[in-house]
Amino acid sequence: MEKQVVAGLGEIGRPILELIMKVSPAIGYDIEESLIDKEKIKKYEKYPTTFLHICIPFTEKFIANIISLNKKFKPKCIVIHSTISPNTTTKIQTQTDVPVMYSATRGVHKRMLFDLRRYTKFFAVDPNVPNATWAAKEFSNLMKKCKVKTKQMSNPITLELAKIVVDTSYYGWLITYAQLSNMIAIQNNVNYDEMWSFADEIHKFLGNRPKMFPGFIGGHCVIPNLDQIGRAHV
């Protein structure tokens, strides 16, 4: 019998732990000790760790923290669910012999458990790493037991960029454009909704004129995620 370890019990880690613990022995770990179920950690202490699921925030100490967690739990594979700077997975892979997988998380934090099952869970691992094929198969099987669909990408950096460029940042730019178009509407004393109604049929037929609503760009990961690209000098 083996266990799963989820490191970081925040808005992503907690739902992932709840999801996994229904199909496998699993423990949660966090720097905030009040969030840890110490009895469960003791219960599964001697169980070897299959996957170490990383759900901690991305900081300058992110890689060092993962290396430390790897030494602590000695998993057969590391799975990163956090949003990270491009090439982070590869940098970590050079510092460990176990496969390091990236699996971007999609969903709204307040309904994350529901969204984890609604969206396909993309993942990627360097195919040249020893046991990469095993890791991909085992992760897919684990997610299947959790009733989560999976899809494998060719390499980690493609998925790292997809999460930032195609998901959160793209959403933020759409809202930014809505803010700009709203400013133009106000300056010219025209109705924002009436102006945008011109695009309704275009979007209906072509699907490429989405109307967003101006205002504060909510979601504490939308704007900060733009910084990840800058850090990587992409």
What are these regions (language model features)?
Residues 1-47, 51:
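NAD(P)+-binding Rossmann beta1-loop-alpha1 motif at the extreme N-terminus of oxidoreductases
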Residues 39-77:
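Rossmann-like NAD(P)-binding element
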Residues 45, 113-116, 209-214:
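Solvent-exposed alpha-helices and their adjacent loops that cap or buttress functional pockets
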Residues 56, 66-67, 75-77, 83-158, ...:
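Rossmann-fold dinucleotide-binding core
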Residues 157-161, 171-233:
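Interdomain hinge/lid region at the active-site interface
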